[in-house]
Amino acid sequence: MNIDRSSWGRLRITGGDRERFLQGLTTINVQSLADGAHGWGAILSPKGRVLTVIDIAKIGDAFLLACEASIADKTRALLERYAVMDDVTFESITGPAHQTWEDPVSVWRAPIVEGAGGVPETDDAVERLRIRAGFMRYGADVDEDHFPFETPLAQFLDYSKGCYVGQEPVFRVHAQGNAARALRGLVVEGDAPLAKGAQIKHAAKDKAGEITSAVAAGDGTTIALGYLHRTVWDVGGTVEIDGRKATVRELPW
């Protein structure tokens, strides 16, 4: 399905320092991007927390950055704050844009490209695919309280990349292997609505996590995203949410 992304913030980044600037600011290894390729990542705080989730594509002599509309102004402000002495220019891009999703596995691989998309972001079918892919919505599934390695962004972290803002705490936790929580998929019995923040319980840990997003799956169950403590995040395990049994799923599923 072609999902409309016309509301997303998009910037064309040019200038002689464009690659070095983005390499030192984002988690994305832009130096490794071939022309036409793209990568997902984040801009982090110095303490390693996720300030904004972004996609960067290399197109000729420019980089194209895309992010959700809700964090577009914040993202540009972060770029401009760090671009003090750098030869970089940020140009807003407007007009129709879309992203093509075929299945949960394809979601994170799909670039944001020009052209109208026929399916709105709010469509239930889009939401089901989004949740099964672990494609996060900023402010719901990830915010400044989270580290990238707790989220599906972990699959894109390049630990051979050089220094960038927030890199040290990310690398330290990776070396120690002691992340306390992670985002997981959940299949919940029943299709009654689940609220954001609903508590996840387990016999071994009463406060095992909380729900961030949920939608009726259309088959009598509910599918959801939620952060689970490492003691209960094993795939195939069961937890309880509002008195309902839920099975833990790997992302994507």
Feature roles, as predicted:
Residues Q23, T27-Q31, I71-D73, A77-M85, ...:
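Short, intrinsically disordered, mixed-charge
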Residues M1-V53:
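Acidic, proline/glycine-enriched N-terminal capping motif
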Residues P111-V187:
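Anionic-ligand-binding alpha/beta catalytic cores of soluble enzymes and soluble regulatory domains
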Residues D17-L22, A72-R76, V113-G117, A192-G197, ...:
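Short, conserved charged micro-motifs
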Residues S7-G9, G39, T52, D61, ...:
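A generic structural signal for short beta-strands and their flanking turns/coil linkers
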Residues D4-L25, E91-E102, N178-E189:
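Short glycine-/aliphatic-rich beta-strand segments at the starts of folded cytosolic domains
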Residues R49, T151-L157, V165-Q167, F171-W253:
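Glycine-rich, small/acidic residue-mixed loop/short-helix segments
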Residues N2-I3, G9-R10, T52-M136, E240:
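Acidic, low-complexity central loop/insert segments
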